[in-house]
C-alpha cells in the first residue's frame, strides 16, 4: 500500500541541524521513504513567528533549501504542482514531494505575496500555528503551556483578512489546512469556502480530548466537503495521560484511524 504523509518538519530540521534529505537521523529521509513505499510526502516550511529571523525571510530560506535537496535526487523524487504530476511521477517510478507552508502569516498581510508563494510551488498552507496571526486564531492561547492543550476556542475565528485569504487560496488552487486552527476558525472555513480542505496533522477528539484534535462534528463536516484528516503521530495528541508527554505508538495511531473510519469512512483519513 502506497503511503501519503501530509506533514513533516524535515526541511526545518535540516535547516537547523544540517544533514541531507537523502539520509539523516530524523523521522523522514528519502531512503526511509523508499523503504516505506511512499507515493507522496508533504514537506512543511514551518515558520515560528517569534523566531529571530523575519518570517518572510525564513520562509524563503526554507523553500530554497527544500528545492536544493529535492533537486539533488531527480532519479528518486520530484516536486509536484498538480494531481497529474503525482500520477506522472508514479508512472515513472518516482516519489512525489509537495511544498507546503505551516504558518499563513508569512505573507505579511499581503495577498500578492500569497500569490507569489503559489508561483513558487506552494500547494497547501496551514493557516495558523500556535499564535494568533492576523488570519485567525488557534485553540492554543499559550504555545508553551502543556495544560493549554485542552483549551478550545469557539469564539475567535477567521479575521476579515483571513476570509479574503482563504477565498484567494481557493481561487489559486492552494489547499486549506485547518490543523492548529481554532474551532471557530474551522467553521468559518466551512462557511466561506466551497472546495475540499484538510486537517493535515490532527486526530480525533473523541479519543484524545486536546484542542489540536477535531471533534466528531468537525470530522463529519470535513468529510461532507470531501476533505481528509491526516493522523498526527505526536503522543500527546494520540492519548491523554496525567502529566503529558505521552509516548507515540502504532496501537494508538490505529485507534484514531479506526475511529475516523467508523465515523465517516476510510476515504477521509
Where are these regions (language model features)?
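N-terminal hydrophobic targeting/anchoring segments and the immediately downstream early-domain regions
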Residues: 1-152, 209-269
Amino acid at each position: 500500500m502506497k503511503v501519503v504523509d501530509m506533514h513533516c518538519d524535515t526541511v526545518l530540521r535540516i535547516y537547523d541541524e544540517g544533514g541531507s534529505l537523502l539520509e539523516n537521523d530524523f523521522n523522514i529521509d528519502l531512503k526511509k521513504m523508499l523503504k516505506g513505499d511512499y507515493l507522496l510526502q508533504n514537506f512543511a516550511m514551518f515558520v515560528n513567528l517569534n523566531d529571530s529571523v523575519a518570517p518572510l525571510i525564513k520562509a524563503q530560506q526554507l523553500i530554497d533549501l527544500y528545492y536544493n535537496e529535492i533537486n539533488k535526487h531527480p532519479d528518486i523524487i520530484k516536486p509536484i504542482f498538480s494531481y497529474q504530476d503525482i500520477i506522472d511521477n508514479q508512472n515513472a517510478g518516482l516519489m512525489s514531494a509537495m511544498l507546503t507552508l505551516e504558518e499563513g502569516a508569512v505573507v505579511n498581510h499581503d495577498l500578492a505575496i500569497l500569490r507569489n508563494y503559489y508561483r513558487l510551488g506552494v500547494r497547501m498552507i496551514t493557516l495558523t500555528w500556535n499564535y494568533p496571526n492576523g488570519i485567525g486564531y488557534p485553540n492554543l492561547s499559550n504555545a508553551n503551556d502543556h495544560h493549554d492543550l485542552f483549551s478550545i476556542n469557539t469564539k475567535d475565528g477567521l479575521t476579515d483578512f483571513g476570509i479574503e485569504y482563504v477565498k484567494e487560496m481557493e481561487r489559486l488552487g492552494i489547499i486549506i489546512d485547518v490543523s492548529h486552527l481554532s474551532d471557530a476558525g474551522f467553521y468559518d472555513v466551512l462557511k466561506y469556502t466551497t472546495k475540499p480542505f484538510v486537517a493535515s496533522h490532527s486526530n480525533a477528539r473523541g479519543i484524545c480530548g486536546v484542542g489540536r484534535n477535531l471533534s466528531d462534528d468537525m470530522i463529519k463536516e470535513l468529510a461532507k466537503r470531501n476533505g481528509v484528516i491526516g493522523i498526527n503521530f505526536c503522543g500527546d495528541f494520540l492519548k491523554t495521560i496525567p502529566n503529558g508527554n505521552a509516548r507515540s505508538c502504532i496501537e494508538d495511531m490505529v485507534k484514531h484511524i479506526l475511529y475516523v473510519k467508523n465515523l465517516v469512512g476510510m476515504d477521509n483519513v
